[in-house]
Regions:
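Membrane-embedded alpha-helical bundles that constitute the cytochrome b-like, heme-associated redox core
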Residues: 1-223
């Protein structure tokens, strides 16, 4: 680890992030193999349609557990918009779509990241509930079960659309930020540029962990 890097995530956060991401990706692939004839070849890779459905269903359970834990873990920081700062950031589009002299400062997660989190949370819950009903279709009237398929697809479309934006902004769009979910550490310069308010708050509270530096004392003199 390089000197001057800041710890932004712990191992628990990273494990849950990748459990959710990989299970979601596998659900997308297996789901496409079941929904569209064009992607029937995916079923062959898993040993047939029956095996594909089993993989999809049990991956859904992993996704459900991961999502519940992720919502519980990140809701306070990523699930609530803070006004007026988040609105100011949105009005400036975070500086991504046009030039702004100064991007409004936000907390650990900006409104774009919060929006993605809420879409994944809402779309994920929708897919879990509809998926369970589709798994056990005899539990409800046929007319109601039929509605589960388009609703399930709606959750997929919402998450999949935001996924590519998240992937771009987490890699090419913000070089260096991918380290947060790989090693748990980010270059302090990059972090300060992307989340200056959070860095200031953590420094003020004495909670900022910088590799190669001793933890600073907080305002009350505790380390």
């Amino acid at each position: 680890m390089k000197k001057g890097y800041v710890q932004v995530t712990d191992s628990y956060e990273r494990i849950l992030h990748w459990m959710l991401a990989l299970s979601c990706l596998l659900l997308c692939v297996t789901g496409l193999g079941m929904m569209f004839q064009t992607f029937n070849f995916i079923g062959l890779l898993f040993g047939g349609l029956k095996s594909l459905k089993l993989v999809h269903n049990f991956t859904g359970l992993v996704f459900a557990v991961s999502l519940i834990l992720v919502i519980r873990m990140w809701w306070k920081e990523a699930g609530v918009f803070v006004l007026p700062e988040d609105l100011d950031w949105c009005m400036a589009a975070g500086g991504y779509l046009w030039h702004v002299d100064k991007v409004p400062e936000t907390g650990k997660y900006n409104p774009g990241q919060k929006a993605f989190f809420l879409v994944v949370a809402g779309g994920g819950i929708l897919m879990i509930l509809t998926g369970l009903i589709m798994w056990f279709p005899t539990t409800l009237p046929v007319e109601l079960v039929r509605w589960m398929y388009p609703l399930h697809a709606l959750g997929f479309v919402a998450i999949f659309a935001f996924f590519f934006i998240h992937l771009y902004l987490g890699t090419i769009g913000n070089p260096g930020s991918v380290d947060a979910m790989v090693t748990g550490w980010m270059d302090k310069k990059v972090l300060t540029m992307l989340h200056p308010k959070w860095v200031k708050e953590m420094e003020h509270e004495g909670k900022l962990v910088v590799y190669g530096e001793e933890k600073k004392s907080d305002a009350h003199g505790h380390s």
